[in-house]
């Protein structure tokens, strides 16, 4: 880009950083830093949570992947990638059930109580890998609008963007993340409409709707595979699950449902940028559909696309850092029964900074952004039955470990030696292996969880032991609802400990 254009692009990145710092609260309580509460200890507004989930899941890498799928498979590819957003309502329903029926207050504490410390460390390791992936995969997308991969402008833009995000997260924590997410969601929606106003009129709606072929080889294999991953994908995303415990259960479920449906629509709409490239026969080799299409429409369209990527990457990255702080400063010390002498906020900030540095190493090395989604999605297939079937059969530590590691091993093998699992392929399309491994892998993971539970359940029945693992009855839930309503009316729901400021 020439000097004038460069000033425009770099200037926006700096202005973006200033605005985010101004929006993020400078002084928050511990409850605000780790749970998103306001200064009075009240949970975040459900509509703020909806906006936060919506934009935090519109990752820079995800909209890029959606457009690339549209460029490769037409509208079939766009719908396929949008399938992932349907896991948000499913995850919301599962968390609603766990909170209501089993009194879960968080993923880590829930696993500790029902599956033991070993299960928690397996789960936490998967979350940390996911959070690590989110750093480099999003900063690399932003860097691509400032220079070629690996170039000095590419790396500088990505690192500056990371520094901006870490900076305002250190001030506001999860509360700051949720507040800035609202602004980023509005910015994304406005610019998406503007970009589509350039792209959509170039073809008829019929052309968009009929692009691609509805066959396994035409991308339907990816649609089915993504649908299977929806059964487990949301549970290893700390950004999503953390927001499942910060407001009342029914409000949370509504927020998750609305955010998931809005996200599905937004991803399909964004994929039309790639579908435009598909219809025009544009080559995206060595680049990405958003970059190629935006460049073909002129510098203003290219700039607007860059702003979209910055907004979406920022929302994901700040949510990633706030969830990382909660996991490392609150959740993991809690399960170990250890209370750190250092201020938990400081611990969280230290991990944010370390992850901000280490998490960018793959970006500098030029890793492929698609791997952050497809590999992790395959590896964590075993989480689906653990959270969806809890209480349907007796929960067992053996069942957790079998389900978790069957999925993890299949995912690792599929990454390092996919040919070894070629016998699982379904169809002959580009995603034949993806579909086969996820279908047969899901069957194996669910069986691995169910069988030990059924065996333990049968043993209890023979011994005449009354099951205590089925959770609260309907009568118990009705009594709790009545008590919660009384407490709300009397203003007894605030936690005085959460009102203590963090001193920043």
Cite the ranges covered by each PLM segment.
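Terminal cytosolic tails of multi-pass membrane transporters
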Residues: 25-30, 39, 421-504
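Helix-loop-helix module between adjacent transmembrane segments
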Residues: 20, 78-170, 229, 309-319, ...
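Selective recognition of specific alpha-helical transmembrane segments in multi-pass small-molecule
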Residues: 11-12, 125-136, 187-197, 222-234, ...
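Hydrophobic alpha-helical segments and their helix-loop junctions in multi-pass secondary transporters
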Residues: 17-27, 131, 135, 139, ...
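Loop-to-transmembrane helix boundary motifs in multi-pass membrane proteins
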Residues: 114-121, 326-371
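Hydrophobic, small-residue-rich membrane helices and short re-entrant helix-turn-helix hairpins
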Residues: 103-112, 173-181, 236-265, 282-291, ...
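Membrane-interface helix-loop-helix modules in multi-pass membrane proteins
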Residues: 35-104, 228, 240, 245-282, ...
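Membrane-interface "cap" regions at the ends of multi-pass membrane proteins
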Residues: 1-63, 169-175, 185, 191, ...
């Amino acid at each position: 880009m020439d000097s004038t254009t460069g000033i425009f692009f770099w200037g926006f990145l700096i202005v973006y950083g200033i605005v985010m710092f101004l929006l993020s609260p400078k002084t928050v309580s511990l409850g605000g830093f780790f749970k998103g509460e306001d200064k009075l200890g009240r949970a975040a507004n459900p509509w703020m949570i909806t906006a936060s989930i919506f934009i935090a899941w519109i990752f820079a890498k995800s909209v890029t992947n959606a457009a690339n799928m549209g460029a490769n498979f037409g509208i079939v590819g766009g719908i396929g990638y949008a399938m992932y957003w349907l896991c948000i309502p499913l995850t919301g329903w599962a968390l609603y059930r766990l909170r209501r029926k089993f009194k879960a207050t968080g993923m880590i504490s829930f696993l500790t109580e029902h599956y033991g410390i070993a299960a928690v460390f397996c789960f936490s390791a998967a979350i940390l890998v996911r959070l690590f992936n989110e750093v480099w995969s999003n900063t690399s997308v932003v860097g691509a609008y400032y220079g070629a991969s690996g170039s000095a402008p590419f790396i500088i833009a990505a690192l500056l963007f990371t520094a901006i995000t870490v900076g305002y997260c250190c001030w506001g924590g999860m509360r700051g993340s949720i507040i800035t997410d609202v602004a980023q969601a509005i910015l994304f929606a406005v610019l998406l409409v503007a970009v589509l106003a350039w792209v959509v009129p170039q073809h008829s709606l019929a052309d968009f709707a009929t692009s691609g072929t509805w066959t396994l080889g035409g991308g339907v294999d990816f649609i089915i595979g993504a649908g299977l991953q929806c059964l487990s994908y949301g549970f290893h995303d700390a950004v999503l699950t953390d927001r499942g415990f910060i407001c009342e259960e029914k409000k949370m479920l509504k927020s998750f449902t609305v955010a998931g449906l809005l996200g599905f629509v937004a991803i399909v709409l964004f994929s039309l940028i790639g579908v435009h490239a598909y219809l025009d026969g544009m080559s995206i080799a060595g680049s990405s559909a958003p970059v190629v299409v935006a460049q073909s429409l002129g510098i203003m369209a290219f700039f607007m696309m860059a702003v979209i990527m910055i907004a979406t990457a920022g929302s994901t990255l700040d949510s990633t850092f706030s969830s990382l702080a909660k996991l490392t400063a609150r959740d993991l010390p809690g399960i170990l029964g250890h209370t750190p002498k250092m201020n938990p906020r400081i611990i969280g900030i230290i991990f944010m900074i370390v992850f901000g540095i280490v998490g960018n190493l793959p970006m500098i090395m030029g890793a492929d952004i698609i791997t952050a989604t497809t590999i992790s999605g395959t590896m964590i297939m075993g989480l689906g039955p653990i959270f969806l079937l809890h209480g349907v059969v007796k929960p067992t530590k053996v069942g957790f470990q079998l389900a978790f590691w069957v999925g993890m091993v299949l995912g690792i093998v599929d990454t390092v030696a996919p040919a070894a699992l070629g016998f699982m392929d379904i169809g002959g399309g580009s995603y034949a292996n993806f579909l086969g491994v996820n279908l047969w892998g899901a069957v194996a993971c669910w069986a691995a969880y169910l069988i030990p539970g059924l065996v333990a359940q049968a043993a209890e029945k023979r011994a005449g032991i009354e099951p205590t693992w089925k959770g609260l009855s309907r009568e118990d839930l009705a009594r709790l609802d009545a008590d919660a309503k009384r407490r709300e009316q009397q203003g007894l729901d605030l936690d005085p400990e959460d009102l203590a400021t963090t001193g920043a």
